[in-house]
Amino acid sequence: KLEIDPALLGRVYESPEITGVVSARAAAETGLAAGTPVVGGAGDNAAAAVGTGVVTAGSAFTTIGTSGVVYAHTDRVTIDPAGRVHTFCCAVPGAWHVMGVTQGAGLSLKWFRDQFCGAEKEAAAGMATDPYVLMDKQAALSPVGANRLLYLPYLMGERTPHLDPQARGVFFGLSAMHEKRDLLRAVME
């Protein structure tokens, strides 16, 4: 028990509940109309779930941005004592979501681009294209499985299934036969 005086805490709202309205001062500073309702809101993936229709038990989605997420809607609290997945209340009142998150999904590809793809960045600039287009073509030259090379994307530690802020990235199975395209494909896979 934390013994925190409830008077010190703000009220908790469900995502769609109106918590107030935009004040005249905030309207002047932001350009929003005074009186516009302000709601409890939602986290990025909880909001994405509503936007993509993942609002019933058993529905799910995945996203890859800086991090990678697998998100599933559930009507009941399902807490994994080992912490292999996260459980949160979601944007649908009375419901929950379970998700797995890896910190370094898209981040790993950007890191690889910035550290090892200077030539692709330079060529792409001269071609008025995105360097990722050239990186995709290079990765396509490596077979599925990147010639048995695995990449663990722990550039910023890890959240699930192994919560460990000290976890570090690894190329596993690296040998003298591997080429840059194999490393790139391993990162993508």
List where the protein language model places each region.
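Active-site core segments that coordinate phosphate-bearing ligands/cofactors
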Residues: 1, 18-189
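Active-site-proximal cap/lid insertion segments
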Residues: 4
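A glycine-/small-polar-enriched, mobile loop at the entrance of the PLP active site in fold-type I
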Residues: 7-15, 98
